[in-house]
């Protein structure tokens, strides 16, 4: 376990995780009881908290055989295209490490 990964706490119906990043201290809850599976990926509802102050609810941990990422809340625009409420630049690779920490919490 790397020094940035904290111990996870398993509760009745959710799993908590923490990750200390360069920009923020991340924490969150995963809800494996509400997990769904499609042909290509596993979707686990989650909430993500930044620095213990801002909580983003309605996120999803998306897992395929070779990739894990966090899907943020979205809305459908006038042209029926899905748009995210959050802009995450591709250069911000820390969010990938947060997704990996969340995935590891599910496995523990």
Regions found by a protein language model. Name each.
Residues 2-108:
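Single-stranded nucleic acid-binding surfaces, predominantly the OB-fold ssDNA-binding core
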